[in-house]
Amino acid sequence: MADGSNREYLNLSTGQLVELALARGEGQLTANGALVAKTGERSGRSPNDRFIVKEPSSEADIEWGPVNKPFKADAFTALWNRVEAFLADKDTFVSNLEVGASKEHYQPVKVTTQYAWHQLFARNLFIVPEEFNAADKPVWQIINAPGFECVPERDGTHSDATVIINFAERKVLLAGLKYAGEMKKSMFSVQNFLLPAKGVLPMHCSANVGADGDTTLFFGLSGTGKTTLSADPKRFLIGDDEHGWAPGGVFNIEGGCYAKCIDLSQKNEPVIWDAIRFGTVLENVVTDENRVPDYTNSSLTENTRAAYPLEHIAQRKLDNCGAEPHAVVFLTCDVSGVLPPVSKLTKEQAAYHFLSGYTAKVGSTEMGSTAAIQSTFSTCFGAPFFPRPAGVYAELLMKRIESFGSQVYLVNTGWTGGPHGIGKRFDIPTTRAIVDAIVSGELKDVETEYLEKLNLHVPVAIPGVDSKLLNPINTWEDKVQYAEFAQHLADSFKANFEKYQVPDSIKNAGPNA
């Protein structure tokens, strides 16, 4: 240590961390009691700056490529040491936390941050255990040093900032970036690598449970409605983003929520609205002169966020766990306006659409994404976070669906009646009515209509939903144009799917090009 004047603050409470964050000028208190912090130029994830150390213990199991980029082991050691030296003469904040609400499948993690607000974020999003590391597992370490500037020529990084995961040494290094979401997503990637080896499917999904103990999962990319739809006043929340599905049940990987705030309203999202209070971290939310958050303001970024612990949600499952799911919902945001609002999937179709991960980048969480909306295919509804080959996760999904008998649905939260710019987006009440019917089991044995081009079965009637909306061709004025757009979408699916080596039963389960 340098001159001895620096301090290591260990396991501070929410109140202490907020107090220190304010005293250190890291953020401001808002009118609703939340702490608001700005992240500077990086207001989302930086996929180009994310690496995994290439080393013998994990190398053969990782799908190397543009998502999982290799980093040299000796370069990692040198950079880790440099960052530790950088922090040696600074105050740091440390907590002993866990990732995974499962006695068997948790990972203990020691989180060290340069900023108090980053430590508060970690304590909100990870699990603060009553007894740390009860099973005495080897401990992971995260270091987050936003003040450290990487030098690519010296450090081997892509830019002045980096996120590097080292499986052999159980270390995660974050340097040069303030966007706190990188911390949670790096540990999600860690669990996504570790869990399949134990027969557990890690999932980029939200989960809730009814009064009768029936679990529903919602898969989807950022902005498709995972957080909004799982925050259901009639049900109990397990979690909003990351879960594991083991034989016998599902468990939350996290201890908090990271909700998008853009256009947040008390009317449409009361559960999230009420969770934003003292102890919550608001990221890049603009406030007025009275410190009242303006959730419509996207001047800093579309990707404004609220990070709060699950304790801020009244209706939640206290143990962060649930039974295996009766219903599994794949949320897709279709910008072409072609997909129906809901379809029932066979297990082969479920594997096909899980591997495809078709959706749109709406208010994308990635750096450099503007408000422009484009369609994308993101494997397993979360390609940026899955280190193993996609087939590993698809196989596990089919296994779990089959052994429990879960029914899978494809729900379009995007456009109808025309593409983005011409058609209109399904409103939240319509999607909620569809989800209510799924959750109650009403759609399990309902009469369906077959859409040949899309190779999908759609219900002919759903309580509380205008039947005209159910078959998308009925919402388009120009039926010829609909057929053209449907053909184009089917071709896109087919072209994207060519990279997968899977049985014909899965290959043929997609749209008919």
UniProtKB/Swiss-Prot annotation:
Q: Which UniProt keywords apply?
A: ATP-binding, Cytoplasm, Decarboxylase, Gluconeogenesis, Lyase, Manganese, Metal-binding, Nucleotide-binding
PROSITE patterns linked: PEPCK_ATP
Q: Catalysed reaction(s)?
A: oxaloacetate + ATP = phosphoenolpyruvate + ADP + CO2
The note on the cofactor says: Binds 1 Mn(2+) ion per subunit.
Cofactor(s) recorded for this entry are: Mn(2+)
Q: Which residues bind Mn(2+)?
A: K185, H204, D241
Q: Where does substrate bind?
A: R45, Y179, K185, R305
Q: Which GO terms describe its molecular function?
A: ATP binding; metal ion binding; phosphoenolpyruvate carboxykinase (ATP) activity
State whether keyword Lyase applies: yes
According to its UniProt record, where is this protein located? Cytoplasm
Q: Which GO terms describe its cellular component?
A: cytosol
Q: What is its EC number?
A: 4.1.1.49
Pathway annotation: Carbohydrate biosynthesis; gluconeogenesis
Principal localisation: cytoplasm
InterPro entries recorded: PEP_carboxykinase_ATP, PEP_carboxykinase_C, PEP_carboxykinase_N, PEPCK_ATP_CS
Q: Where does ATP bind?
A: K185, H204, G220, L221, S222, G223, T224, G225, K226, T227, T228, E269, R305, T431
User: Tell me, which GO biological process terms does this entry list?
Assistant: gluconeogenesis
Q: How does it assemble?
A: Monomer.
- Its job: Involved in the gluconeogenesis. Catalyzes the conversion of oxaloacetate (OAA) to phosphoenolpyruvate (PEP) through direct phosphoryl transfer between the nucleoside triphosphate and OAA.
Recorded family membership = Belongs to the phosphoenolpyruvate carboxykinase (ATP) family.
Q: What is this protein called?
A: Phosphoenolpyruvate carboxykinase (ATP)
Q: Which species is this record about?
A: Shewanella pealeana (strain ATCC 700345 / ANG-SQ1)
